[in-house]
Amino acid sequence: MAASCPLPVTPDLPTLRAKLQGLLQFLRDALSISNAHTVDFYTESVWEELVDLPPETVLAALRKSASETEALPSETRPLVEAEWEAGMTDFPKIFCETSQKLVSVEAFALAAKYYSVQNLGICTPFEQLLVALRGNQNQRIGENQKAVEFMNMKKSHEVQAMSELISSIADYYGIKQVIDLGSGKGYLSSFLSLKYGLKVYGIDSSNTNTHGAEERNRKLKKHWKLCHAQSRLDVNGLALKMAKERKVQNKVKNKADTEEVFNNSPTNQEKMPTSAILPDFSGSVISNIRNQMETLHSQPHQEENLCFENSFSLINLLPINAVEPTSSQQIPNRETSEANKERRKMTSKSSESNIYSPLTSFITADSELHDIIKDLEDCLMVGLHTCGDLAPNTLRIFTSNSEIKGVCSVGCCYHLLSEEFENQHKERTQEKWGFPMCHYLKEERWCCGRNARMSACLALERVAAGQGLPTESLFYRAVLQDIIKDCYGITKCDRHVGKIYSKCSSFLDYVRRSLKKLGLDESKLPEKIIMNYYEKYKPRMNELEAFNMLKVVLAPCIETLILLDRLCYLKEQEDIAWSALVKLFDPVKSPRCYAVIALKKQQ
């Protein structure tokens, strides 16, 4: 195990359960907003049923709340938010006791902020965890380096942050094997293998993904080798440049010294040594180059340093053993000593174990890893945006396998989670459910509902950053539903319209295309009738906009419930030494930004 500091203190199980109780109290009234489907917004008179305020009032209050939060300095926000707790139990101020309609948007927004992961005080700072895992080892590399060119900006951001944490945990335990569940295209797996020298098994249920990951990894290895070669050329080129500069400096100094000796004492003139004017390829020069590179990366990139970025970023993206030290003999004559040949041979052998192996398998909570991975050893289990039930099943596999010493799971697609207490009237054969996992929520027989889980996927931070909701497309779909109900007598339709909106030039075009896709006779409706529906509901579009903003504001609370459920489950396990929620990503770049992390007790 690497030298390290004590791991950060995290909330214990009783504290987390107390947080859950307060959250449930709020959600019992608020969940009806999240569970309302925008498709049925006009047909079911959703606004009149759930909100007792004008839409203009709701929008103005939510905008004011968002601007006030944004105006607070980041360092003072936790102090202000800590003062909210005293008023959080006075729910009649938010919802009417008799009608259960929303009556105070301000109180609603305040409660929703309080019950988010970031403000509940249940999140462990990423940097604090890294420092504890690493002890006195190297500090975190900044994200201003370019990652592998095969990833977009979002994926690069996610992979760099998560792989850094995983490698730190691996070093902490002295582990070399990693299992990446739901590995998809293999970005995380490849990066862990190539940059950090870990042996990674990427498991995905899609054979297409597995083959794609293999091909991508092959190209990535080729790219990595080119980076390796280029990085050595960069180092050698800089060494030659520095040597030439020193040669010029020595010539100038030489000339000055010679003139001084000649003028002061002509009889003592001596021939200058040849070493004074030859390039200096001693170890000190190479050391100086390395020091420059380290200094460059230990400081923020200033404008004057930009010219060095491309030269040096390659080396820091390579594994530790990928770049060979450049000796003084290698630069001038390009010859490799026997010792260097032997070292390269050893490096090649060691790198054979640092591989990425994509595998195809459908993983459940009962999957037997020994049947999938023949050389299973002490390892870490990770998952980057594991979909639906795979995220909770990752935690179950972790707790039931002694070889898995740590887990780092970032889930997504909450709408695909199976819920134990949803549709209880239906016959069920499933034994292990995606939600709930912990004892407390099982005892409460808590159910979110699919629409609420779907709304948990909404990205509040992106909306706040100006990436607004697609109100018009939602409006088109809600009006279409009323047309289908009135003109075709259909109240529930199992078929989906899909992403037709982006292909349509107008509302009329949207309705025609949608009816055709749904298998309905669109010739039955003249243009005038269709446009009458549009004109009828257009003045009420702001109701839909305001309602969707309420859902967006509430979304973090439902995500908090799901994440707290998983963390409480881990806290209930006896052999787990440490567990936490950690915000890994920038939520604007990657909305599903929270990792559930747990480490087992050392044997």
Swiss-Prot record:
The keyword Transferase applies. InterPro entries: Methyltranfer_dom, METTL25, SAM-dependent_MTases_sf. It is an enzyme of class 2 (transferase). Keywords: Methyltransferase, Transferase. Its EC number is 2.1.1.-. GO terms for biological process: methylation. Residues 326-352 are annotated as: Disordered. Disulfide bonds: none annotated. The keyword Ion transport does not apply. One of its GO terms (molecular function) is methyltransferase activity. Probable methyltransferase. This is Probable methyltransferase-like protein 25. The gene is METTL25.
